[in-house]
């Protein structure tokens, strides 16, 4: 269901006041500021209110039995996004640690640096997202509409994201893949790919901290459990991509996923997602070199960064 249609059916009191409902983000333009070398953050925060946002209302109705993961909560909380520390996108996109599936067990040690993926900006409602062009040929118009300086690193990152989406470079040829620009389009792609609307999303979460990243340190694995009870079925992974608002590259995968409880040397705790690939999955052939095994010979795993999501059947 379209979020705008959904919220139009709700009484004004549900939306947080007696006046006619307004989305959290204005339809009259999206003011962004260029915080670091290549990252966007919204300037305006949502108005103070304890009422659920339109995105939260959509989630509760579309996925009533599925808790909202932290990765999505961050995207619908512009105040938190605006206050996060500046982060270089080069760092957050390359800090990957690979390990063998057999080495993932309670008591094992792993050195990690939790960082956010590509999507640091706020998620848009479908009506707003669909009103903004999303095509390389429209990039000058997009930059003007979103107040992004032409020729900036931010603009180049957006150009790259558009090109990757248009060239369908997200995943292998036998995978369903799609770039999503709104919460509704992400939910619908995941539901269509998994063949059911009875789905849930999970993400890596650092407990008790709002920081955009954590120090690199050694973590002890306290618990490991499969995300789904039956292996071999499709899942949908959504990776954040650098853009002026939240854009995700989503694709199906047959990887095995684990929920991993971690305890850091400094007391930091995390509930992390580990995905293990048994084939020579595209784009990370170096992973096999790092762990010293032949490509595709044994499952190789990595921890999903903050902000990325995994969709599975309930």
Swiss-Prot record:
Keyword annotations: Signal
PROSITE patterns according to UniProt: BURP
InterPro entries: BURP, BURP_dom
Pfam families on file: BURP
Residues in BURP domain copies: 98-314
Residues annotated as signal peptide: 1-16
Tissue expression from the record: Expressed in shoot and panicles.
The protein's name in its UniProt record: BURP domain-containing protein 8
Source species: Oryza sativa subsp. japonica (Rice)
Lineage: Eukaryota, Viridiplantae, Streptophyta, Embryophyta, Tracheophyta
Gene that produces this protein: BURP8
């Amino acid at each position: 269901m379209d979020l705008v249609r959904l919220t139009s059916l709700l009484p004004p009191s549900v939306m947080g006041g007696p006046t006619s409902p307004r989305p959290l983000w204005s339809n009259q333009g999206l003011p962004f500021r260029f915080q670091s070398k290549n990252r966007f953050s919204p300037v305006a925060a949502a108005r103070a209110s304890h009422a659920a946002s339109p995105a939260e209302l959509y989630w509760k109705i579309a996925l009533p039995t599925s808790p909202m993961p932290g990765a999505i909560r961050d995207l619908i909380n512009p105040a938190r996004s605006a206050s996060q520390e500046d982060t270089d996108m080069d760092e957050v996109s390359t800090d990957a640690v690979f390990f063998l599936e057999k080495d993932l067990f309670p008591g094992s040690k792993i050195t990690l640096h939790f960082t956010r993926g590509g999507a640091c900006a706020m998620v848009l409602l479908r009506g707003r997202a669909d009103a903004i062009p999303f095509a390389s040929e429209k990039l000058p118009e997009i930059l003007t509409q979103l107040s992004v300086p032409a020729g900036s690193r931010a603009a180049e990152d957006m150009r790259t994201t558009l090109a990757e989406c248009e060239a369908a470079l997200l995943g292998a040829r036998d995978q369903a893949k799609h770039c999503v620009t709104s919460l509704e389009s992400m939910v619908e792609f995941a539901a269509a790919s998994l063949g059911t609307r009875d789905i849930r999303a999970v993400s890596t979460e650092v407990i008790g901290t709002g920081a955009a990243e954590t120090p690199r340190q050694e973590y002890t694995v306290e618990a490991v459990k499969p995300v789904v009870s039956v292996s071999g079925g499709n899942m949908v992974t959504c990776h954040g991509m650098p853009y002026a608002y939240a854009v995700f590259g989503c694709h199906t995968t047959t990887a095995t996923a684990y929920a991993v409880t971690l305890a850091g040397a400094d007391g930091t705790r995390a509930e992390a997602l580990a995905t293990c690939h048994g084939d020579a999955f595209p784009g990370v052939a170096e992973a096999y070199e790092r762990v010293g095994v032949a490509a595709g010979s044994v499952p190789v795993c990595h921890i999903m960064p903050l902000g990325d999501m995994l969709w599975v059947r309930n």
